[in-house]
Amino acid sequence: MFLALWEFDVKPGFESRFEKVYGPDGDWAQFFRGDPHYRETRLLRDALRPNAYVTLDLWDSRDAYEHFQQQNREAYLALDRSCEAMTLREKHLGSFDEVS
């Protein structure tokens, strides 16, 4: 299993919209579901900083994730651009492989 971990600071007033777009049934998850190697997305909100969120995107493997990004680069970038208005900051926290 592979995990891509992202952190976001969401603009005040955009929390509900952000949660819909980035949640487990949101636009990103629906986009990823086009690939059979995508597993799930989890969205977590910081208990102490209510405008801070992390997303966990789980895939079968790092190769599957990278292949999806390469094959869908334009659509990925277009979706990412459409979400920019909701966030103050987006940071890739890491790419993690499961240790068995």
Enumerate the predicted regions with their spans.
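Short, low-order "capping/linker" segments at domain edges
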Residues: F96-S100
